Amino acid sequence: DGRVIHADQETDHLPALNDVVIARSGFSRIISFRIMVNGKLLDVYEADGIIISTPTGSTGYNLSAGGPVVNPKANVILVTPICPHSLQSNSLVLSQDDEIDIYIENVRESQLEEAYVTFDGQVARKLQPGDVLQVRRSKKIARIIKVKGDSFYRILRIKVGGQNEEE
């Protein structure tokens, strides 16, 4: 679940099965993020955006941004920066029970022009400096139908690896 906090008030509370993404729009400047995990500073990023992904979403935007592919049975949350302005910004793998708070900040005294948060690429909300995105494990459980005989790794090989089904 993702919650947007603006001026100490919750403005949105939306679920996401795959990912929650904060990204700049168009030609806006990079965004500064202060990321807290369980109330402790994890890191500060200057980047085009940040992806918070579930294992189910790890083969989508997260993978394209250089994040790891994770088995859907893993109980983790992925944090992947998008085009970070840094020499050492890797994806991080956190526990599914970790509470993630992302603070949107100005970069080097410049004004953030436009940034948005999207939930599974469907619903978008505009963000401003000072806003906080809270990401928590949802209490809702999604039941996913699995075709018998297909393993995660076989499907991964076919869809992401570009191999045909006979291999």
What is each of the regions a protein language model found here?
Residues 1-51, 59-167:
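Catalytic phosphate-donor-binding core of small-molecule kinases
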